[in-house]
Regions:
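Conserved C-terminal RecA-like helicase domain
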Residues: 24-67, 227-228, 234-329, 357-362
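Conserved two-lobed SF2 helicase motor
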Residues: 74-94, 301-338
């Protein structure tokens, strides 16, 4: 008896053992990510390489909160599921039976539960799982979690901290230090590195660099030039990562490095044996950015920059080339340096400031953890770059002592604390009686966002009969019970503060939401989308508009009129979340529909940039790519999927054909269902996904049909079809910059799978 098609058919050469033993436990692990998008792809690759050898199937559902129905079929045939926080939240809202199948929830980069809107979502998702699925084990992983025992006590109060495991061992020794200049400027200066903390300097390396007056100023003076000079110094020891806090800094450091290289006798890093690999990389990047783009040229010298506005396929190429050794120095933001396992010998910290705020000690140490290739190096180097002697002292004092890493604090607890300060006019002391205070509605933007996210999450979890009750005390009691299970409730209790003020605050706001949405069916429809209240109301209005249009023009559902139907849906999609992102930087909302149509039609990034750069005020092609990434593939796909859900549940419109896959078309930039299927399985090159889909001989295949056909094709045949490297599906990350936090989940068999296996 054959098994159902595997979601990762490209690994067919790794023969899986037969799943014939009914006693063999079936699990599916879903991974919810908080680090940059590259990490989840790497996690899935490594999990698949190990677990598929023992018959466990690894799948991924990346992206934001868009609902792509066919992708949920992966859940029926998977053991380990890699998902984003947003995606897991959406799955639990729309597929409640999934919760009962969870067995293990593994949260990588677990410190991402810290104070932020994303941290709040992770906290409430884990709370929901703890309440509804007590059999599921939850494990948080982090290298920068100083209050791990506190988090462990929240996850399992009865364990009394025995469920906390701390491992100090590291496969390589990490040397951390600060680079600074010494000497009088008029005489020239020498740059040295002091390794160790302010109290305990391990050793001192003098004269790493020298600088002299050139005309009227010292060179190198700017941080970018100092970082470039240090990169050339350390590159002789192994790969270098220049960690920056903003995309502009990453680009500036790479340009400075290129300028410094051009002044040397050998303006190329690495050996001659890497030239062919770099030339091929340059050609691949040129396909996306053009032959004249600076990245196309930089990579031939063994250097590059990496940040979130670079097109996703180009980021994948850069990551793989860095891992393979073709790139020797990579200048990157935290999008790459947080959590990703990289072959880094030295991390140079270019700056510790972002938007006039100094980055946290936790962020520094998380980036520092990239240094020292496991089992390849005996030690790694992390060097902070100081502007002057005083800056060096400050950096050493703040960052080099790991005891300074900030504890992870709940967003819910932080919301309570800050609102209490607003009410009291001072910080509440531990043990202070706060039972009778009334928390005010927030005025600051971040607190308002937190409060709105919290009330929507609570509204999702509270039973309808409780939400609609006229008994305010009953609603407060229900809110209190939910909040007590959150990390915030745990940490508020540790301060010996009453949870009642927060319960009253949230109950009041949830009741107000319910009054704004008196129709339970409309309320449920909005909550399934994950939109804000206003966004949900906008989606209901848009769905009614589309439904009325279809009533007046039923012929729009005919396959021949698909472009008109597509534009009808896209034009109606003006929900709040989309309006905000689409009109950012004074861009016109009118650009969304035509650009989305061209994106789906297969226009290349270069073609879209050439046509829309004036309309989008996009000076560089990466700005156009960023617009597509944030507006089209995330927010528009989310908005359209929400409208389609409401069309189906409230208007009874059966979603078939291309209309059902429109969110996936927007997400992946392809125009057929089979091409969407291919992209969902990890073929992130749009042309490759389209080409492979065209080879499928099955007319109008379902997702199962397509994966079954692909499963029967040998890996060399798939590779030949794609005209690409031997691992065409290796980089499967579809994460966006909105994706934060990583989970691994173990799922028991779906009922139909259980029957199938029993029949075997």
């Amino acid at each position: 008896m054959g098994h159902p098609p595997r979601p990762r058919p490209h690994r067919r050469n790794r023969r899986q053992p037969p799943r014939s033993d009914p006693a063999l436990p079936r699990s599916a692990a879903g991974r919810l990510r908080g680090a940059p998008r590259a990490l989840a792809a790497q996690v899935e690759r490594h999990l698949a390489a190990s677990l598929e050898l023992v018959g466990l199937r690894v799948s991924s559902l990346f992206g934001g909160a868009e609902h792509v129905r066919y992708e949920n079929q992966l859940l029926d045939h998977t053991d380990v599921l890699v998902v984003t926080t947003e995606k897991l939240d959406l799955l639990l809202r729309n597929t409640p039976e999934l919760a009962g199948r969870l067995r293990l929830v593994l949260v990588d980069e677990g410190h991402s539960i810290d104070r932020s809107a994303r941290g709040l979502r992770l906290e409430t998702v884990l709370t929901r799982i703890r309440r509804t699925t007590p059999q599921a084990r939850i494990v948080l992983l982090s290298a920068v979690l100083p209050n791990g025992e506190d988090i462990a006590r929240w996850l399992e109060p009865t364990a009394d901290g025995t469920n906390h495991a701390k491992i100090d061992w590291s496969p390589s020794q990490l040397r951390t230090g600060v680079f600074s200049w010494q000497g009088q400027e008029k005489d020239g200066q020498t740059g040295s590195i002091h390794y160790g903390t302010a109290q305990d300097r391990d050793f001192f390396v003098p004269k790493v660099l020298t600088r002299r007056l050139t005309r009227t100023r010292l060179f190198p003076r700017d941080l970018k030039d100092v970082a470039a000079a240090l990169a050339l110094h350390f590159e002789r020891l192994g790969p270098v990562l220049i960690s920056t806090t903003q995309p502009a800094y990453a680009q500036a450091a790479a340009r400075a490095l290129q300028t410094a290289l051009d002044k040397t006798d050998t303006p190329v890093l690495g050996g001659r044996n890497q030239r062919d690999q770099r030339r091929a990389l340059s050609e691949r990047i040129a396909e996306h950015l053009g032959e004249e783009h600076e990245l196309t040229v930089m990579v031939t010298q063994g250097i590059a920059y990496h940040h979130g506005t670079i097109p996703q396929p180009v980021r994948h190429l850069l990551e793989r080339s860095y891992r393979d050794g073709a790139l020797r120095v990579l200048c990157a933001t935290s999008t790459l340096s947080q959590g990703m396992n990289l072959p880094v010998k030295t991390v140079l910290v270019h700056s510790t400031w972002r938007n006039q705020e100094q980055i946290g000690v936790r962020e520094f140490w998380n980036a520092a953890g990239r240094a020292g290739r496991a089992f390849q190096e005996t030690e790694g180097h992390v060097v902070l770059i100081a502007k002057d002697t005083q800056d060096a002292r400050n950096l050493r004092r703040r960052y080099l002592d790991k005891d300074n890493i900030e504890p992870v604090l709940s967003t819910i607890g932080a919301l309570y604390h800050r609102l209490a300060i607003t009410r009291l006019g001072t910080r509440p002391a531990p043990g202070q009686n706060l039972t009778d205070i009334d928390l005010p509605d927030p005025e600051l933007e971040d607190l308002t966002d937190w409060a709105q996210e919290l009330e929507l999450q609570l509204l999702t979890m509270l039973a309808e009969e409780v939400v609609d009750t006229p008994d305010q005390h009953r609603l407060e009691d229900a809110a209190h019970d939910l909040l007590a299970h959150t990390l915030g409730g745990h940490q508020i209790g540790a301060q010996e503060w009453s949870l009642k003020p927060l319960a009253r605050f949230t109950a009041r706001r949830v009741a107000a939401l319910a009054r704004q949405l008196p129709d339970p069916a409309a309320r449920a429809a909005i909550l399934r989308t994950g939109l804000s209240l206003q966004g949900g109301l906008d989606a209901i209005t848009a769905a009614e508009q589309v439904a009325n249009t279809l009533t007046e023009h039923p012929g729009l559902l005919d396959p021949a009129t698909w472009p008109a139907l597509r534009d009808t849906v896209l034009t109606a999609t003006t929900i709040q979340e989309l309006r905000r992102s689409a009109t950012d930087k004074n861009r016109p909302i009118g650009a969304v529909v035509p650009l989305a149509g061209d994106w789906i039609a297969g226009w290349t990034l270069q073609e879209i940039h050439h046509h829309y750069q004036l309309l989008l005020a996009a000076k560089d092609i990466t700005a156009t790519s960023d617009y597509i990434d944030k507006v089209i593939t995330h927010d528009l796909a989310w908005a359209v999927s929400s409208i389609l859900q409401i069309l189906e549940t409230r208007h009874g419109i059966n979603l078939e054909g291309p209309l059902a896959t429109l969110p996936a078309m927007l997400k992946y930039g392809v125009d057929t269902a089979p091409a969407c299927y291919a992209a969902s399985l990890g073929i992130h090159q749009r042309s490759a996904a389209t080409g492979l889909a065209a080879r499928c001989p099955i007319p109008e295949p379902s997702f199962s049909d397509f994966t079954g056909w692909l499963d029967d094709r040998p890996a060399p045949s798939v590779t030949a079809t794609l005209h690409t490297d031997p691992q065409p599906l290796a980089d499967t990350g579809q994460l966006t910059d909105h994706d934060q936090v990583e989970l691994a989940i173990t799922i028991s068999p779906a009922p139909e799978d259980r029957r199938r296996r029993t029949s075997r």
